[in-house]
């Protein structure tokens, strides 16, 4: 039987797997990506793409391609709640930073605006990045078995186009093979939470809803019908305003049920105008889960993406978390495989990302449940008669004590959903604690709601804050100063000794450390003073930034032996022990 050898095998070619393949190739790692499917996603699926994820795609050089295909942030921001598109609109709110009270928060946080792009459009863009960097991706290549030993992992692969089987032997394997992960089940990863807590069906449609939506443009519409056996339908927009991918929740729905006539009835009811024609392109049943792997590493095998965390689509966190898993893991694998770091560095992947996965799973489930108070206040529930719905709506709009109470409850329900639509802190505010963050300091207390608001900091374990600086009159983000194939030391006006230390330590340890000097009339000119205000170290201090743009360490000043100090930190971070004092 044919045996192929590689350093890393990536199982799965969704958002997590393709991103891992692209980043590994960019880092010079010999890797192979496989998927049993014949191509990228064939339906919309995930769609909200937050700023951290766009930053990853920016780093991969494909942000421009993303913008060409995506629905931009400036037409994403109106969320409507109505009995149908043509019917009564009961509530409206702003989302994804579109509100006047949140717009500046989002603009200050990142050089990259978020966007709405369905998965079947996003995956080819990441695939383009992967191939541009030389990644090998094999379609129609199905994992059928795997086992690991002390020195590596052997995977049995079936070529689905020829039915031939062959083995791939790798040093490490990434299981990014989705919610039914064979890697997770075969290796024995344990999960916490609850599987299959609800059923839903997505229906990808061609339907022109321009006259109902162009004047109140948004990425998602919520439709609560006046008479139906479904609770609510949620309508993500795939292409403004003629392509949609609604999903329908119904209690007790049989798994796999795809009765097209029933679905056509739900769709007509949600549109509310019998003259609007539509065409069903694809029907996809799925389950709502609330689970996360207890650890993301067992031996030489790692989980990433939906293989590690599975949850409600609320908050739009799924593909974002998946891509960011890979952004955390790939540089660590590259560091270990190049000999720059000890294998123990790979333990920090689970230490850092598993708590993020747990937070995301819990937040998504909480947001899923937090739709119900609005529905209850609106008086629209699954299974009610049209007469009951009319009575409830008449009371809601009426001049009565009960009507006023319900209107207040309706507003409160919309406000509660801010934790789904404007959860900027959940999207951007990850804080890491692991051995890859040496000499950890206490994180600052949150000054605002930690889920709704992102609070930038340079405390180690925080993501590097974005501000604009200038180089030769060109505006540059601080995030663009970071190199994914190495570490970056950010210094100031008094940082020459740190720059020399970085060169010496990089040469001694054979680990790339680039430098960038920021400040007034420095290499990167801080004319506005925004960097000086946020850096939290002096002109003679420094920040050591990891390839994934998280701050590994900082020093507020200049010690007597900056080279020795930096050497000790790097050796500790890389799991190579400590140098003599």
Predicted stretch roles:
Residues 25-45:
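Glycine-rich FAD pyrophosphate-binding loop
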């Amino acid at each position: 039987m044919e045996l192929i050898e590689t350093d890393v095998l990536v199982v799965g070619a969704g958002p997590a797997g393709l991103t891992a393949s692209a980043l590994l190739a960019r880092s010079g790692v010999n890797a192979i990506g496989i998927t049993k499917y014949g191509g990228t996603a064939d339906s919309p699926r995930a769609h909200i793409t937050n700023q951290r994820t766009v930053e990853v795609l920016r780093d991969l050089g494909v942000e421009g391609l993303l913008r060409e295909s995506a629905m931009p942030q400036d037409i994403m921001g109106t969320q409507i709640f109505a009995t149908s598109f043509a019917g009564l609109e009961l509530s409206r709110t702003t989302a994804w930073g579109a509100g006047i009270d949140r717009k500046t928060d989002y603009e200050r946080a990142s050089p990259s605006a978020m966007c709405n792009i369905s998965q079947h459009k996003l995956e080819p863009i990441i695939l383009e990045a992967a191939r541009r960097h030389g990644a090998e991706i094999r379609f129609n290549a199905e994992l059928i078995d795997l086992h690991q030993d002390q020195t590596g992992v052997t995977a049995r692969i079936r070529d689905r186009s020829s039915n031939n089987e062959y083995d791939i032997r790798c040093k490490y394997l990434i299981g990014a093979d989705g919610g039914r992960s064979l890697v997770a089940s075969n290796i024995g990863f344990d999960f916490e939470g609850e599987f299959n807590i609800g059923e839903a069906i997505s229906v990808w449609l061609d339907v022109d809803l321009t006259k109902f939506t162009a004047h109140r443009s948004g990425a998602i519409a919520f439709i609560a019908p006046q008479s139906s056996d479904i609770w609510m339908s949620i309508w993500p927009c795939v292409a403004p305003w003629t392509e949609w991918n609604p999903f329908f929740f119904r209690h007790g729905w049989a798994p796999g049920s795809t009765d097209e006539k029933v679905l056509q009835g739900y769709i007509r009811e949600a549109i509310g105008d019998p003259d609007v024609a539509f065409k069903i392109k694809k029907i996809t049943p799925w389950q709502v889960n609330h689970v996360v792997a207890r650890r993301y590493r067992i031996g030489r095998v790692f989980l990433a993406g939906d293989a590690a965390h599975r949850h409600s689509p609320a908050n739009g966190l799924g593909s974002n978390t998946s891509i960011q898993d890979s952004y955390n893991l790939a540089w660590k694998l590259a560091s270990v495989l190049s000999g720059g770091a000890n294998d123990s560095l790979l333990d920090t992947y689970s230490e850092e990302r598993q708590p993020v996965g747990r937070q995301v799973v819990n937040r998504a489930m909480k947001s899923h449940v937090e739709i119900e108070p609005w529905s209850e206040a609106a008086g629209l529930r699954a299974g009610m008669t049209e007469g009951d719905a009319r009575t409830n709506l008449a009371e809601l709009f009426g001049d009565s004590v009960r009507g006023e109470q319900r209107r207040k409850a309706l507003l409160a329900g919309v406000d509660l959903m801010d934790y789904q639509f404007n959860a900027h802190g959940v999207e951007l505010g990850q804080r890491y604690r692991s051995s890859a963050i040496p000499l950890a300091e206490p994180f600052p207390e949150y000054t605002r709601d930690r889920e709704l608001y992102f609070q930038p900091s340079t405390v180690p374990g925080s993501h590097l804050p974005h501000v604009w600086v200038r180089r030769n009159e060109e505006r540059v983000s601080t995030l663009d100063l970071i190199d994914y194939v190495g570490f970056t030391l950010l210094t100031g006006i008094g940082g020459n000794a740190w720059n020399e230390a970085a060169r010496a330590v990089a040469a001694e340890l054979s680990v790339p450390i680039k430098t960038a000097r920021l400040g007034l009339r420095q290499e990167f000119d801080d004319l506005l003073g925004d960097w000086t205000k946020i850096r939290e170290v002096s002109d003679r201090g420094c920040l050591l930034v990891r390839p994934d743009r998280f701050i590994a360490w900082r020093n507020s000043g200049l010690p007597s032996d900056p080279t020795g100090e930096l050497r000790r930190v790097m050796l500790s971070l890389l799991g190579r022990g400590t140098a003599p004092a």
